[in-house]
Every structure is written in structure tokens, then in C-alpha cells.
Amino acid sequence: MNDFGNFFKNATNFEPYDFQKKFANDDALPDIINVPTGLGKTECIILGWLWKRYNEDKLHSNCYTPRRLIYSLPMRTLVEQVYDKVEEWIHKLNLQKEFLLFKIIGGESDEDWDLYPEKNEIIIGTQDMLLSRALNRGYGMSRFRWPIQFGFLNTDSLWVFDEIQLMGGAVKTTVQLDAFRTLFGVSKRTKTIWMSATTNIEWLETVDSPNINDKAILRLTPADLDNKHIISLTKAKKNLQFMEFDTKELSDTAREIIKRHKAGTRTFAIFNTVKKATDISKAIEKMKPGFPVILIHSQFREEDRKKNLNRLMTENNAIVVSTQVIEAGVDVSCRTLFTELAPWHSLIQRFGRCNRYAEFDDAEIIILNENYDEINNAKNEEKDLRQSGKKALPYEYRDLKESLEILKGIHQGFVSIETLPEIKLKLNILNHVIRKKDILELFDTTRDISGNDTDISVYVRDRNDFNVQVFWRDIVGKSDEVIDSEDFPAKEELCSAPVSDIRELVKKKITLWEKDWYDGGWTKIRQPERVIPGKTIMISSDHGYYSNYGWDLSSRDKVKPIAHKQISMDASDEEDPNSEGNWKSIELHSDEVVTKAGEILSKLLLSKTEEEYILKGSRWHDAGKAHPAFQARIKLESIKKAGIKLPAKAPKDAWYNPKELIHQKNYRKYFRHELASGLLAINNGEPDIVAYLATSHHGKVRVSIRSMPNEMIPVDMNKKFARGLWDGDVVPSVNLGGGKTVPSTTLNLDLMEIGGGTTGKSWVSRATKLYNDPEIGIFRLSYYEGIIRSADRRASGGLA
């Protein structure tokens, strides 16, 4: 297929617009796509990228298109619809083998995208899930996989941020990340594209990326402006009207919405909060209008959210009550639109849902105004704005007043995309801009001494979008302190809930649980401040808090847990399930991982130096399994029967269970074989980067070496110890394959200390030097970690 027009039409059944062809065929990628709503920005990006990657062998190397497309949406409600659309395109083009498709909205079921760094992938997700991973603090996933996804998302990736006017302060984070990749360097090209119908280029100005005038912008071309279909869409008229709205008299509003609904069409009613939308939906249903009432917001479990979205797309005679989640990514049209007053960029998006296809001659938009007089008379003094602020939530009064002034200039009458005034919009962003110091600190994934992680919510969410993910399980009769038997939730189980609601439950002594990554269980949350955005929290199904209307703090009905498959996490610091499998010696397994890493590298075409780092790190990664503390976990009689010297892998029944293990002579709680691997590499003269990569390949020991709570302590109190290793431990000689045999080695833990003692440099100083090295840096280092981890997992699991 050598023509993008045919390629596009085969996927969509439509001819591409000229701006879409320009994106696909130009060598250079734009920085910004600024095209009116409803004209196919999503098709432009997805199909344009597919076309470029499909024909990559025909392009010059300096036109390289990143192999991962990261498509970020501001709200999870939209992810499924875009995912389904892209899946359909890939099937129509018969590209399922060449392009892998994933979605990230919480839960672990789609997290295996990081197994294949050499393959073409499209990853669709919400900005909080994607940006948290790009900042090395991935929401809703194993903390031990943070570094892999940090490395992969910041390398060889084309980031696309859709509807950036809805992103809040996260816009600045995306710009800073783009600047950091230039500052620290990456192994493969990574690019960012920002998209919106209402983009103000000044939104993309930050302290580390000040040259906004250098941004290349893709707009409608002259050919597009003469296109009859585009002209009809941009001129499609809507009759603009105003109506008073009182939350104390919802029945009046509900009655008017029903009255204005025209049979055989959709009516949208968009409200600014979940509570208002839910209350109006209930009020309309109570009046039994005789046609479907569909509620759309962000606080449903996946099955209910999908069901509602499917009804939205298929019901042609319905009232759809929604929050602002419908502003972006939903390709659907209505005849009648009710909307609360909102910031102007939001109103433009909402207006774009009305008469979207120019199919109505009598389309109408009704502005619902709850506080018209207060907004109109509000002064601009900070004190006045603060006092009025609560009534305007989740927005600010100044934004609503600005919209009101614009609307007053339009008056009541007909409006269209073409006639809406172009206003240079500002984003109200809190003063939380991530800086170089912050991203360097986030590279270290070790918790602080209190067991807490850095709260990155101010960098990845809209300022009013502070939510956690909750799920329900039947846990009656189990301990309310620690629960070991419940696995991590699948994405189907998760529901978004406000942080404020969950903190209130903790204050009321309602038992809730959070994941304990040290010991692997779920522990009771005792302090409200432990509840931070992005956390995953378990609730007893007996407590309630969920109904047909989604997350519902007032509901006490038992919640039916979602049937789920067990999710494989990366275990706790104590566990090492990846070592279960067919019998394999350290020599054989090391050879397999090096071979697999070589196969991956053959597709990535990195520099020879980088390949050497990765292959050496792979060779040394399991050297520490020769340590007696690791070998003590496997039954001696099983080892003898198998005839394997120093096994790296053993079948499940060959391992001692936890109760048996604690009685074994060389057992060490929290033992980490990969730290032993790194120490062996250093003690045997390997470069620091090889030691680091060997140590970091499970994501559990990286920049810091710190002993664990309840760790076994040597009898000699003067001995240094950490992660099950004691100063002076002797590791027997071990064959690593590839002609590399490590002699018997006495481990030296002096590098735990500042200055490093007899080793010359501490572990922290070695790691810090690596990520400050301009030839390596934080993104390359994590990328190397990820490749070794992928090779190890694929070799261990027999995956191609």
C-alpha cells in the first residue's frame, strides 16, 4: 500500500483531509496540532503514525518515527472509545501482527506492554496514569516496575496529548519532560505533540522550554478551508439561549430538559460536578420521561462505564446527563445541549458536541446559569474571588466571568464554530512546575524512612482532579490489620473516588486497606494523610459506597465484587516468584538472557557502547544466586535429584514454603540476590554501570542500599548488613556462561557508607555519577534497566 489516501480510507471509509495527509507524508513532525473540534485530530495522529511506521524502511534515518505511540487523554471515560476505534482501524488494515495495542487506565491487566521494547506499540491511557509512569511513580501498578516504564516511556516514544485545555498544570509537566529529555539525553528519539481546538501557545512556555515561537503548528490547510464538507461543519448553526438554574429546585431544570428534548434525537445536559450530574439524572428518571436517561461521569467501574458509553453511542433518542468528561474524545452529536457556565475553552468543546455533523436545522444550546448575578457583579480582587470560589468549583469565578463576558458579546442568537470568537485563553495553573532537581530525586524509587513516596499528583492531574482508585472484595472475618490473601485488582474492579471522600472514611474509622510492598499484603490505613492521589485502596464489599450511579458515599448496600483473574505483581521484597520454573543453572539462564537481550538489541540499533553495557549487565544479573542464602531456599534433596549445580530456576515444588524456610540454616529474610550480583561485579572489577544494571534488574534495589524493618541482624553487631547480605559473606565460584567464571568472592559492604570505605566510593555516589553522566543520564539508565528486565522475563517465561 503506497498511498496514504487509500490507507486512511481502508481504515475509516472516508477520504482524509489535507491536514491529515500533510501529517502522514511530511518528514518532520509538528509540535502542535490546532484544528477545530470534530475534524479528525485522532485519525490524523493514529493513522498518520501507523503510516509512518508501516513505511519506516523507506524513510531516511533522520526522519525516524518513534516506535511507541503514547496517546494521552485527560479522562478515563474516553479511553475505551478511542481504544475501540483504533482497534477497529488496525483490524481493517490487517496490521494486528505488526502493531500491538494497549490501554492504561489502572489495574495491571495491560501492563505487559513493557515486555517488548523493540515492537511497534500504541498505548492509550489517561494523563495521570501515563504521566505518573513517565515520572517514575506509576499509579495503580507494581512499584518495582516503575523504572522500566519510566525508561521506555521517555525513550523511542511519540507522546500525543489530546485536549490539553483540560489538563490543568499537567500541561507544564509535559513540556518540562520534553525539555528534560533534551537535557539528559535519550537513546532513541522521543517527541511530544500537543493537540487542541483552543490551544494558546503560551501554555507551552516553561522555565526549561522558553522558546515557544519555535513550535511548529499544524493547522487546516488552504485546501481544507475550501473543502465543502469542512465548510458545512464549521458553519453548522446552533441557537444560543440562557436559562436560570437553581440546585435547590432540580425538578424545574429536569422538567425543562425533558420538555426541550425532541423525539428521535439526543439531548445532552452537561454539569460541572459529579454530584450535580447525578442529582439531575435521578430527578429526570423520577419523572419517567419515556425514553432512556444515560449518566456519564468518571466515577464508575469499567463494566458500568462501558455500558453507559455504549448506550450513549447507540441510543438515538435519549437524554445524556454528563460531567465535563464528554468534552473530549467522544465522537457523537446532539440536537439539544444544556450546559452549565464553564471556562470558555470548555464551552467551545461542549458546543462542538451540538450539531456536530451539521445534521440539524434547529439545534439549540441552553446555557444553565446558577449564579448569573454573582458572577456578573464579582470584582476581580483576590478576596472577593476566594469568597466566591466554592460556588464555582471545580472552576474559578474569574474563568466563569470571562466566559460570561464573551457570551454577552455574542448575545442570544445563532452561533457556529466559524463565528465563535477566538480568545487568547489562559490556563489557571498552580505553581507546581517540575524542575531538574525534582526529576533527579524521582529517579530513586526508594521510599523515605517513614515508608512514604513523593506525592506527584500536582504534576500529573488537573488541580481539581484528586482521586484514588478503589475496589471491593469479600473480606468478612479476615483480620482488619493485615490481609495477605487478596491479590492486586484488575482494571475491571477499579473505580475512581475523591481523595476527600476516602480521607473522611478513614477519619470515621472505616477500615480500608492499602498495599504493603515490603511484605506483600494489604495493611489498614490509619491516618487520613496516607490517602494521596493515585493510590489503590481496598474496601470491604459490606461497607457499600457504590450504586447504579457509580461511586456513592451515601449507599450502604453491599457491593458485588467483580470476578477477576489473579494479577501477577512483582511480589514483595521478601518474595521472588520469577525464580520458579524449569530447572536451570545460573550458567544456562545467564546465556538465555544474554541471547534474548541480543535479539532485542538487533532490532533497536543502539550504539555499540550501549549494547555492551546491556549485554554485560545481562551476563551478571543472576550471579548473586550463587549466594548460600538464595540456594538455601531450594530443597537440597531436589537439587541433588535434578543434578543441577547452583540453580537459578527450580520448579515450584522444589522450593521451601515460608514456614519451612525460616528454619533453614542460611535463610535471610528480605534477601535480594540482585544486590549480591552487583557487589560481585564490583568486587571483580566490572564497571559501575554493569554493577548497577545487574543490581537493578528487579526494580527492588537501585540507587539506595538500605536495611529493611525486621531484617535479620548478624550476631556481630559491628557487621554491616542490608537486604539479607552481611559484610564478609562468601559467595562460591560461579559460571555465568559465555566463558565467564567468577571466583569465590568475599562480599564487602563498605560501599553502604558515605565515602565507601575500602571500596573507594559509596553505592549512592556510584549511582549518582551514572545518572549525572551526560553520556548516560536518568533516561538511558532506566532504558537499559528495562531492556535487561524484558530479556530476563521473556527468557524466564519462554516468551518470544
Predicted stretch roles:
Residues 1-34:
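Conserved pre-motif I regulatory segment
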Residues 29, 42-64:
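Walker A/P-loop NTP-binding motif
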Residues 64-89, 128-129, 274:
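Conserved Walker A/P-loop ATP-binding site and its immediately adjacent core
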Residues 90-144:
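Inter-Walker segment of RecA-like/P-loop motor cores
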Residues 128-132, 137-187:
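SF2 helicase catalytic motif II
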Residues 189-191, 195-261:
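Interdomain hinge/linker at the junction between the two RecA-like core domains of SF2 helicases
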Residues 255-256, 262, 279-289, 295-310, ...:
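C-terminal helicase lobe and adjacent C-terminal extensions/tails of nucleic-acid helicase motors
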Residues 379-403, 605-798:
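Divalent metal-dependent catalytic cores for phosphoryl transfer on phosphate-bearing substrates
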